Design a protein with these regions (language model features):
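Terminal catalytic/cofactor-binding subdomain
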Residues: 1-137, 144-148, 177-187, 191-194
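Generic recognition of stable, solvent-exposed alpha-helical segments in well-folded globular domains
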Residues: 26, 82, 86, 127, ...
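Histidine-centered divalent-metal-coordination microenvironment in nucleic-acid enzymes
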Residues: 30, 144-157, 329-336
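Loop-rich catalytic cores of soluble enzymes, especially ATP-dependent carboxylate-amine ligases
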Residues: 121-138, 146, 155-322, 342, ...
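Substrate-recognition/cap regions that form aromatic- and gly/pro-loop-enriched pockets
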Residues: 323-324, 330-422
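Extended, compositionally biased alpha-helical segments that mediate assembly or anchoring
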Residues: 427-527
């Protein structure tokens, strides 16, 4: 049965064909710096890239070697991908003989000691970022923090929100309406994100060095030497127990049925001590190895496949920003770096994501119960580990059904929103993107995870050799790519500006670190 909001969107779009032309997007792409031999770079953040603390487009994530590239908000896919390509080209001018690792799961690593924590200078905000990362390392191990991914930021056009709100009666505030609709999108995303893992998962194997000394896994050796560990039908080990995962957080029941519950759950996790973390110093005698001894140091520590977001003011917590203004956009966090695309993702993926997320927004989205969430978690874990297994079934309404059938039905619904996007733009690009995903459902060998394993097996490549092949291929691609003079000048200017901004921050500090942290955490208490 067609949902009210699907019918509404089709009716509104028919009367206003350009209603969906202004989708706002942004991409955050992480990449490890590596040596020519495929080992994790031990060098500091390249000076030519400016300050990782204050640069608008180039920063670091957990490790000094884990670069993160950020595109500005844009309504054009070509503009977003073009900007991301320019950032890559610029970065390669500063890397010397280093390369960017073309996979999500890390290259050759020598344990936690071989993963340098990111440094941001001497200001309070810089120290807070580094101490937070030290805490993550103590709590989960540094190895998990060396995993790279792609985050996709999405928000429908303002014209859409205004038209939908008015059509639904304009009851209450428009922002409350928008927030409630985003929460519905998030609940449906949790119901169907397994499909994204199947279609775009690109981490079915890992380098054996990633699991050295660990016995808590059931991966199989892929080669006689045991250099590569894998699961034959896995899609995205990054999204499972070996990747971004936390046993301690399993009991954290985050509710997306209303914003108040979401904020309260995370606030309590940030302010309530967690006995297992009391062993790590959090300010005693001025020694900081973590920001606090709570279940979460800050809200970013909560691992999730999607986040509700609002741009925060300087010094403002993410939760405070959401309380202040409601949800402004969502951040999809379950995308692996695609080794077969120079940028790690491509236009087809973005067009499908737009159609998928719009589908999540306009389908009915009843409140989610803990029992349903447990089923959804099981479905996701099943697809992570066994997504391409012949005859695989998932839990659906009315019992277990084949993944292929559930995926086919979901893609039919996504094709309807793709058709509306195509009508708005006067082309067939979104429907073509959906058709490409339908082909992956019909033939599992067309998925990135299957293509990776097939190439590794055919050419006798261990994981790190496969990663080096594509890392070197894309390094050559970006080193030979022309970077327009205005783009080069803008990035060089931003690097210089960021260094000056860091110096100004360091000179402007007036509080000691303990007082700075106390003032920051007062925001959570006030939520």
């Amino acid at each position: 049965m067609t949902s009210h909001w699907q019918t509404q969107l089709e009716r509104l779009a028919a009367g206003q064909p350009t209603l969906l032309t202004g989708i706002r997007r942004g991409v955050e792409k992480e990449s490890l710096r590596i040596s020519p031999e495929g080992t994790l770079a031990q060098t500091p953040h390249p000076p030519g890239l400016g300050s990782a603390l204050t640069h608008g487009s180039i920063t670091t994530d957990y490790s000094e070697a884990l670069l993160e590239f950020i595109t500005p908000v844009s309504t054009g896919i070509d503009e977003t991908l073009g900007t991301l390509a320019d950032i890559h080209s610029f970065v390669y001018r500063q890397l010397g003989n280093e390369r960017l690792w073309a996979l999500s799961m890390p290259c050759i690593v020598s344990g936690d000691a071989g993963i340098p924590v990111a440094r941001y200078g001497s200001s309070n905000v810089a120290r807070m970022k580094t101490v937070y990362r030290l805490g993550l390392g103590h709590r989960y191990g540094r190895m998990m923090q060396a995993i790279a991914g792609i985050h996709y930021n999405f928000s429908p056009p303002e014209a859409f929100w205004e038209a939908a709100w008015q059509d639904d009666g304009a009851q209450g505030s428009r922002q409350d309406y928008i927030t409630d609709r985003y929460l519905g999108l998030i609940r449906n995303f949790h119901r169907w994100s397994w499909l994204l893992i199947y279609l775009f998962g690109a981490s079915p194997a890992v380098c054996a060095s990633f699991l050295r000394g660990r016995k808590d896994h059931s991966l199989e050796p892929m080669d006689p030497e045991g250099n590569t560990l894998y699961r034959p039908h896995a899609t995205s080990l990054r999204m499972g127990g070996l990747g971004y995962n936390s046993e301690a957080q399993r009991g954290l029941a985050v509710c997306y049925n209303d914003l108040d519950s979401y904020l309260k759950t995370l606030k309590d996790a940030i302010l309530t001590p967690h006995p297992a973390y009391a062993q790590f110093p959090s300010g005693e005698g001025g020694d900081y190895e973590q920001l606090n001894d709570s279940l979460l140091q800050i809200e970013n520590e909560f691992y999730s496949t999607i986040r509700p977001k609002r741009v925060a003011a300087s010094g403002e917590t993410a939760l405070t920003a959401l309380r202040r203004g409601g949800i402004e956009y969502i951040e999809v966090r379950c995308l692996d770096v695609n080794p077969f695309a120079p940028l790690g993702l491509d236009e087809e993926t973005i067009r499908f994501l737009d159609a998928f997320l719009l589908h999540c927004l306009v389908e009915d989205s009843p409140p989610c119960s803990p029992a349903e969430q447990a089923v959804l978690d099981e479905n996701l874990a099943t697809v992570v580990d066994r997504g391409r297994e012949p005859g695989l079934t998932l839990a659906g309404t009315g019992g277990r059904r084949p993944l292929s059938a559930l995926a086919g039905e979901r893609l039919q619904g996504i094709a309807r929103t793709a058709a509306l996007l195509d009508a708005a733009h006067g082309d067939g690009a979104c429907r073509a993107a959906v058709a490409a995903q339908e082909a992956k459902v019909q033939d599992t060998e067309a998925t990135p995870s299957a293509r990776m394993l097939a190439e590794m097996g055919r050419d006798g490549l261990p994981f790190y050799r496969f990663g080096l092949r594509y890392s070197e291929r894309w390094a050559q691609y970006f080193r030979e790519r022309t970077l327009a003079g205005d783009a080069l000048a803008a990035l060089e200017a931003e690097s210089e500006r960021s260094l000056e901004a860091q110096r100004e921050l360091e000179a402007a500090d007036t509080l000691d670190f303990a007082s700075y942290l106390a003032a920051y955490y007062d925001q959570y208490a006030a939520l």
